[in-house]
Amino acid sequence: MEGKMPLIGEKFPEMEVVTNLGNIKLPDDFKGKWFVLFSHPGDFTPVCTTEFFSFAKHHDDFKKLNTELIGLSVDSKISHIEWINWIKQNLKIDIKFPIIADPMGHVATKLGMIQAQSATQTVRAVFIVDDRSTIRAILYYPMETGRNISEILRLIKSLQMVDKYKIVTPANWPNNEIIGDNVLNPPPATQNDIEERTKKYKGYAWWLTYQDANKADVDEAKEITGE
């Protein structure tokens, strides 16, 4: 599994992985679906346990967005099974998504998930892959800070709206401080685009115009992110 780390806009590399739920072929087994592949430094650790609890709590919200979850660490399959059983018994929640067992670190190395300070532990990385197997976003968090699961949901919803409506979303959407839950138009490409934008849309300048977002999409975004 040698090679450079995959980048946003590239196809997710093909691989077969071992999980607590059986072997999976990536990305082939998820064709037609989005998926979030996220790594964690280790089983039976405090921050990772809170993250898995939150991912499990929001599992149905990811499914509403046609998105599957896949965890990963360099722990063994047995360790994953024991850990999620502990979470179920003590925190009263089921982890129903697969967790990749990568004890030799081959998958983590291929995806650029290994920490600089440690040759064996994975960082808190997130790969968001769309229904065409294209990497749409890559996020990294330090060991000391747990991920915001609502932000990952918001990002997926935004990317799906970009695909559907050919728009772009502002900071903190759907609660932007300037245009609220409206969405932005992408930068105009030609002089004709500039003239059309200023006639058709509201805005502050020819390069900063916006339009109403679909209400159902706004409502869903607010629901899944808890806004």
Curated annotation (Swiss-Prot):
Residues 6-161 form the Thioredoxin domain. One of its GO terms (molecular function) is thioredoxin peroxidase activity. It catalyses: a hydroperoxide + [thioredoxin]-dithiol = an alcohol + [thioredoxin]-disulfide + H2O. It comes from the Archaea. The active site is at C48. Its main location: cytoplasm. It is found in: Cytoplasm. Keywords: Antioxidant, Cytoplasm, Oxidoreductase, Peroxidase, Redox-active center. Its EC number is 1.11.1.24. It is an enzyme of class 1 (oxidoreductase). InterPro entries: AhpC/TSA, Peroxiredoxin, Peroxiredoxin_AhpC-typ, Peroxiredoxin_C, Peroxiredoxin_TDXH, PRX_1cys, Thioredoxin-like_sf, Thioredoxin_domain. Substrate binds at R124. CDD domains: PRX_1cys. Gene3D superfamilies: Antioxidant, Horf6, Chain A, domain2, Glutaredoxin. Disulfide bonds: none annotated. One of its GO terms (cellular component) is cytosol. Homodecamer. Pentamer of dimers that assemble into a ring structure. The active site is a conserved redox-active cysteine residue, the peroxidatic cysteine (C(P)), which makes the nucleophilic attack on the peroxide substrate. The peroxide oxidizes the C(P)-SH to cysteine sulfenic acid (C(P)-SOH), which then reacts with another cysteine residue, the resolving cysteine (C(R)), to form a disulfide bridge. The disulfide is subsequently reduced by an appropriate electron donor to complete the catalytic cycle. In this 1-Cys peroxiredoxin, no C(R) is present and C(P) instead forms a disulfide with a cysteine from another protein or with a small thiol molecule. HAMAP family: Peroxiredoxin. Thiol-specific peroxidase that catalyzes the reduction of hydrogen peroxide and organic hydroperoxides to water and alcohols, respectively. Plays a role in cell protection against oxidative stress by detoxifying peroxides. NCBIfam families: PRK13189.1, PRK13191.1. PANTHER family: ALKYL HYDROPEROXIDE REDUCTASE C (PTHR10681:SF121), THIOREDOXIN PEROXIDASE (PTHR10681). Belongs to the peroxiredoxin family. Prx6 subfamily. This is Peroxiredoxin 1. It comes from Picrophilus torridus (strain ATCC 700027 / DSM 9790 / JCM 10055 / NBRC 100828 / KAW 2/3).
